Every structure is written in structure tokens, then in C-alpha cells.
Amino acid sequence: MRLRARVGVAVCMVLGAVALFKGFDGGLKDKSANAYNNELASNGPYSFFQAYRLNELSFQRFYRTLPQSEIRELVQHEVDEGAQASSAVITKTALAPSANVRPAQVVASGPEKRLNVVLIMVESLSADYLGVFGNKKNLTPKLDKLAEESLLLTNLYAIGTRTVRGLEALSAGLPPLPGQSIVRRPNNGNLFTLGSVLRERGYLTKFIYGGFGYFDNMNAYFAANGYEIIDRSSMPREKVGFANVWGVADEFLLNRTLEELDASHAAGKPVFAHVMTTSNHRPYTFPAGRIDLPSKSGRNGAVKYTDYAIGTFIEQARSKPWFDDTIFIVMADHCASSAGKEKLSIPKYHIPALVYAPKHVKPGRLDRLASQIDFPPTILAMLQMSYPSLFLGHDLTRSDHEEQRAFISNYQEIGYLRIGDDGAKRFVVLSPKKKVNVYRVAEDGETLLMEEGHEDLVREALVYY
């Protein structure tokens, strides 16, 4: 009797588990031709947890689109145009005949430069913290000095409000999609990236992060795309003099970057190091005695400490044998705050970027409107590389490419900022419920004035997104 009772309980548990699994399984949804019925079927625990995990919005369902055949044709045009802006010669060959979009072959106008590239993405560094952009608090003395010796981009905009947005823009060169960043989405490996192009040229590609890279799926994303991962878990305690909940202090992160560059040089390999800082983030703590502001003094102290760390890194790099053969890029991932008088407040996406390579990049200012997604092809153009390109961005160093545009987004709204032939700055905003608005940007750079028409501009935005 006892045995029979146990068997009965076991059977009930198995059946209960099956029923529970079926209750959470989303496989029964989308079986009906009726969209309302499908929504009812999906409105359960499985869909709740699935939506929480993926955090995605269906672009086709919620946003205005163009027919797929038209999109493919127009995207192909943009890929070809992006390549045209990156080289002297374009050969359009069917390098991937099965793909919807054919890569455009970029053929460099000169011999390839096998230079190291160090891309330092600075946490939350809004342009208005820098003295070169008008700040009077002397928060960035080292970056301001470095800007005088660099190519300074004065009109660059972040694509989003989170670190993962900056990471996707600088790796894959893609405009932002509503919902979750590609970094956090499933099936995000083996993409066409800046790293994939450089690895084919024999580069070591490294993602170096001061925090634990499982946060926001960073390690999984970069590993799935062929990067070597170096994060906080890779850094011996004796080499980390200070850390907080977000990561090791920036000076120790950059010390590790120096070690990686030394090792790559010793191995005779060029390296692309994508470095992500953490110190300019709450709780805004950092080692004592570095700057004239105390730890926990808020954002200003954290900005000045990060400035100190980057300046010290550059000074140390100048004594290295690989310095003359290295391009250093300093850029923010996003701004410190996105709140403004508009849902998408354009000034709240304005970020600094400077390119420093005394032997290879002439100092100056680049004032054209630009996006983070323009940097992968720009970096490759500086290296004078020939490659099959799927990038939508443009080489910013070419003055003969007239199109000036940028992309910005929050979770649901995505914007396309464009300077027209008439010199006016207009802004297309795509929102859920297939809503599209076109604005002229007022003289203050933030106020948006509604305008009618401009269907050609709307089509441009729809193609990119």
C-alpha cells in the first residue's frame, strides 16, 4: 500500500510538471490567423517571463515600415554609399550571394597601415563636462590638453542612453532598434563587426572591462563575436588598488590595458583593444590623492578622476615602443542624463570623441554631424584597409561626403537627425502604434517644431531602422 501511494504521488508530480510546463510554454500562441486570439494565447506566465528576459519590441508590429523588397534595395544603396564614403574605389561584387544585402567591397587608396587601435569608451561622459565644449569647472584638464593634439569631433551623438547601446554601435555599427540592445538579445553571435574585419587581418581583438562582464551580457556578446574577454575577474587582486561595486578604478583598468598592449607587441601582433571604463558611475568613488576633489564628491569628482586616469595612461603609453604605431580614441558611451524638455532631447545625446595618433592623424576639429555608428568604417579608413563592408556608417575623415545625419533613441522612440540641403536641421521620430513625426530643430538645438510632409526624409529613417 505504501509503495502504491508513493507511485501515485510520483505520477501526480510528473503530470503536474507537464501541465505546468505546458502552461508556461509559448508554443501554442500564434497558431490562429486571428491576431486577437494569438494575443490572448500569449498573455500568460511564459510570455511575461519571456518578455522580461528578451525585453524586445516587434518593429514590424509596432512601427511604420516599408515593404521588404523596397527596404532591401534601399539598404543596399546605403551600404554601397557607406563604402563609397570610405575609399577611393568601390567594386560591387556579390560576395555573399545568398544574403539579402550584398557587401560593398571597399578598396583603400593607399597601402594598409597595421596600427594598434585603442578605443576607450568612457562611462557617461557628456560633452558638456569638457572644457573644450565650454565647461568652466576645470574637470577635464588632461582631456582638454589632449584634444589640442587630436582630431576632435565636436558634433557627435550617442545612439542611446545605456552602455550596451554604445557597445553595439562601436562594434557592429548598427542604428539602435527599439527595446533591447543587440548586446542583450539572443542569437547575437558571428556578426559583421569591426573586430571581425580586423581579425581577418591578423589582429588580436580584446574587450577590456573594469566590471564583471556578465553584466548586461557583455562577455557573452563579445565572446560570441570573437573577442578575447578581459574583465574584473581576470585581474589579480594585488594589481587592483581600488574597486567599487561597478568595477576596478579606471587607472588600474588602463594599467591592465598597457600590459595587454605590451604583450601583443612582444608577440609581433597588432591589437584592437575596446576598453570600457566604470569610474564615472555611482557611487562615484575612486582612490584618494589623485585629484583635488574627494571621492564620493558626485559626478564632477568622478569625471575629473577619469580624466586623470586617461591622461596618466597616455603619458605612460608615450614611453612604449608601440606608441608611434597606435591610434588612441576616447569617446563616451552615452551622456550622464537623457532627461530634457523633449522625449528625445537632442543635446542630451551630445558626446565627445577625440582621435590621437601624432604620427598618423593630423590634429584639428571635425564639426560635421556624426553618429557613433560611423566609427567602425572611420577606423578602418584610418588603417587604409580594403574589406567587404556591410556597415551603414560613413568614413568621417572624407570631406567630400555631404550627408550629415545621426541616430538617437530611448527605449521606445527612435530618432533620425538630418541636416538638409537647405541647412535646416530636421528630426524624424518613430514611435509605437506606427506613429511618425517630423520636426524642425529650433535654434536652441533642443526645441522641436512640428512640420508636415518631408516623406523623403521619413523614408530615409525607415530604411536605416
Describe these PLM feature segments:
Residues M1-L115:
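N-terminal secretory/membrane-targeting segments
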